[in-house]
Design a protein with these regions (language model features):
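C-terminal and inter-domain tail/linker signature
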Residues: 1-139
Length: 139
């Protein structure tokens, strides 16, 4: 199963880096739920995931995710990503700063029948907000 999951994660990374709706429907179950820090309620299905990507791309039109490492157990994956992009649009109400970001994210996925059915997304929003100048550097 771990080779299958690795292939699915590769498809997922291609999906998030392109926001391709066809790939969304291939890799994301319509019954999927996504827990993200920017929404009080879980997002659902491919449409929910596309809305997350839309929010990110509205603030960082060139954003790209690099999958750094995974830990796979049965049908579950812990994944560490690096997100990079330029803050060239409004993000969470913060106007474009023109600053580049490089932010870590740790996400947890569950797969069923070759598709994502659950994700807990944990991007380092504190670091992101500091990097775009919305918060002062700490320390």
């Amino acid at each position: 199963m771990s080779n299958e999951i690795k292939e699915l994660m590769s498809t997922f990374v291609k999906f998030i880096n392109t926001a391709d709706e066809k790939l969304a429907n291939e890799i994301v179950s319509q019954k999927a739920v996504f827990f993200v820090p920017t929404s009080p309620e879980p997002l659902k299905g491919a449409e929910g995931y596309m809305s997350v990507l839309g929010m990110m791309r509205s603030g960082f039109s060139d954003i790209q995710w690099t999958l750094e490492e995974t830990v796979i157990e049965d049908n579950r994956v812990a994944a560490r990503f690096t997100m990079k992009g330029t803050h060239n649009g409004t993000f969470m109400g913060i106007p474009a700063s023109g600053k580049n970001i490089s932010v870590q994210a740790t996400n947890f996925y569950e797969f069923e029948d070759g598709k994502i059915v659950k994700e807990y997304g944990q991007p380092d929003l504190l670091s992101l907000l500091i990097q775009i100048g919305a918060l002062p550097h700490l320390g």
